[in-house]
Amino acid sequence: MYILCALLVGTATTATAAAAQPRLVKIQDQNFVLATTGESVVLTGPNVVVKGPPYLPEVSGSTFCVDHTDDECKAAGNCTSCTSFNQADVDHIKSMGWNQIRLGVVWAGAQPRDEDALDPEFLRRLHEVLDLTDRNGLAVILDNHGDMVASAGCGNGVPMWFSKKAAPELIGKPLTTGLPYKLVPSINVKNTEGYDHCGSDEAKWAAFAGDPNYNLLNECCLAMNSPNPAGLGWTEINQRAMDFMVLPGPGRDDFVRFWRLMAAAAADHPSAFAAELMNEPMTIRRGAMFDTWRAAAEAISAEVPDMSVSLSDVGEGAVLPEWVGEHDAGVFISTSTTRWIRESSNLFYAWHYYGQPSDPQQAVRNMLALGESWNVPTFMTEFMDCGAWNACVAANVSFSYWHYSAYCTTGPAFGDLVVPDETFGGCMLGWGGGDSSKTCA
């Protein structure tokens, strides 16, 4: 009976992989290529990310997105932002000369319950967006977007149920920073702007404890998380969640399950060519993190064999690869996983640029050196700086700028609407500056 079950499971897995449609874009050595011709392609375009419920835009409307989130409307509380992504948006994106989007598929929104399934409403929206991009040949990175780890720690990305498993005794408690991170003043949460609004007031921190939208409802979170302070990511509750995710065990299994389900959902959508496993992961456990990337990549490949899958370092920074020149890119990564990277045919290195190193051209050189070391392409999947844009153009490096729209209507800039009943998305953790027509001439 056991052998029969094993055979049935194996057959089902093989059938799923065989049923997946070929991707629009694939990887060949250190390049992205068009699957139909094998021609190298540089992918460019915007981020399309919704950080709160319903976590994806609706495919509706007939005009392309234009945000109004300037200082004047913020002061008046009458800003406007987009809630849709439609044919007019695709046409506009193509008119700008772009050929891809980085689409947020936030774990907290895609899988709000600890179960072997994705949320039906999330799937409905996802399929509608990917049907649209399939019809138009617009390449899509599926970005497990998060900032400063988890809702339970005033960040976003990792779902509340996961934090409850990782650190149940810290849910709804004042945020604290443990060793060794508390020794670095700039990332100690007590030094984060807005922390003093609640400080150690346990009653205030306990409000909405355990709610999936804690990060948008609790006043202590709201006092700190409109910008994107690193102090939130290195708190004890968020580091417990990261450890639970990257170390071997049930937390890593949960993360891999999420990506297996996401890959299965995208199997019939050839435009969904890539999976970015986690936006800006906040952990110094590099070896365990790369082993987790490997486990997730293998699960994705079992569903969609030619889907490109990201590797990334802490915060997706462009600084760590300075190790390449002296130590090789695999420092702190197991020999087995380093070998797996070099022997792969579907991995790419995802990175961001927000001013480190100070010279964006040096950042690009760092990334190209890492790509050469591992024989993988690199992709700058987030940035705002025109210097980085132009450096990538000069080096034929793919990029996705932050961002097409804020895709949010929460907080005072939008009149303090009731979350989540009257709002869309989440205006937090670096939400402003949406620009559907960004240029860097």
Where are these regions (language model features)?
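Aromatic- and acidic-residue-enriched segments that line the glycan-binding/catalytic groove
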Residues: A117, D147-A241, E326, G415-V419
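Cleavable N-terminal signal peptides of Sec/SRP-targeted secreted and luminal proteins
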Residues: M1-A19
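Aromatic-lined substrate-binding rim segments of carbohydrate-active enzymes
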Residues: D70-F162, A230, M262-A266, M289-P305, ...
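Short catalytic/ligand-binding loop motif for oxyanion handling, primarily in non-cytosolic enzymes
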Residues: Y55, G109-R113, M148-G157, M282-R285, ...
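N-terminal carbohydrate-binding accessory modules
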Residues: A17-Q100, R135, A139, G172, ...
